Every structure is written in C-alpha cells, then in structure tokens.
Amino acid sequence: MKQLLDFIPLIIFFTVYKLHDIYAATGALMATTLLQMIVVWVMYKKLERSHWITLVLVLGFGAMTLFFHNEAFIKWKVTVLYAAFGSALWISQFLFRKPLIKKMLGKEMSLPDAVWNRINFSWGLFFWMVGALNVYIAFYLPTEIWVDFKVFGVLGLMLVSTLLTGIYIYRYLPTNNQQDKE
C-alpha cells in the first residue's frame, strides 16, 4: 500500500503536465507529495528517511521552479535525489563498512557479505547513472520527453534493475533442502 501511495504524486504530475504545463504540474506535484506524506504519517505513524528527502526536494525545487518560473529546477530534482540515494549507498559501504541495502533487507534474507556489497555498489551505481541520464534528457531533449522519462523511463529502469538484482540474489538463497536440514 505504501509503495502505491508513492506513485500517486507521479501520476498526478504526469496528468497535469499533459493537460496544462510544467508549472501547473510542478504545483500539483508539490501538493500531492505533501498530501501523500500526511496520509503515510496518519496510516503508519512514521515517515521513512527517503520520504523526508523526497518531500524536502520536491517542495524546495518545486518552489524555486514556480518562483523563478524556470523548469530547470524541477528537472534537477530527479538528479539530486538519485545522487543522494547513490551517495548514501556508497558512503554506507565504503566509509561505514555497513551496506545500507543489507540494513534495509537483511531481515528479509540472509546473504553473504560479499553479495550484499555487490548489490549495494550496483544500486549506488544505478542511481548515479539514472541521475546522469536525467541530466542529459532534461537539458538536451524537449520537456515532454523528459516528463515521459521521469514517469515511465525511470520506472522501467527501476523494474529492470530490481529484476536483475532478484536473479542475482536467487542463486544465494537457501534451497528447501537446506532449510529442512536446519
């Protein structure tokens, strides 16, 4: 349910952009993101760190977009967000020696540390690459293409990366025979 709520501001942004323009879509994104966070808070009594980061970036970059009437700000938000996520993953691994991915998913599955490190590094790289791709699409292609990329391209890349991670993890998961022996 929480993941479904994460898509609502994106859907509203896309719809309002197609019906109006980037500025109306930015205002709608700001309002629906704030509303989304209120709903998540009421339902779960907690906001994840990623929700706080997203809220601050959407409101900050959205406000600058509207105040300066310059769409570059909202376009930069995607890159800044993914650079922050990628950096957090790499800092957790290389500075603190505790991969953030393991902290997030370690209760769900048991994997060797080397596997957690590879997954953590790969997702950090993924976020940095999507951020870089966003810069190219946002500033060298028309805004309409950027909006489509932001909504569908990033989602598609995320699904492919998740699928590849799942395939990679699968060979390290215990089989039923191993679980029966324990």
UniProtKB/Swiss-Prot annotation:
Superkingdom as given in the UniProt entry: Bacteria
Gene Ontology CC terms, in alphabetical order: plasma membrane
Membrane-traversing stretches: 22-42, 53-73, 76-96, 121-141, 149-169
The keyword Cell inner membrane belongs to this UniProt entry's keyword annotation: yes
Main location: membrane
Signal peptide segment: none
PANTHER family listed in its UniProt record: INNER MEMBRANE-SPANNING PROTEIN YCIB (PTHR36917:SF1), INTRACELLULAR SEPTATION PROTEIN A-RELATED (PTHR36917)
Function of the molecule: Plays a role in cell envelope biogenesis, maintenance of cell envelope integrity and membrane homeostasis.
Protein name listed in UniProt: Inner membrane-spanning protein YciB
Native organism: Tolumonas auensis (strain DSM 9187 / NBRC 110442 / TA 4)
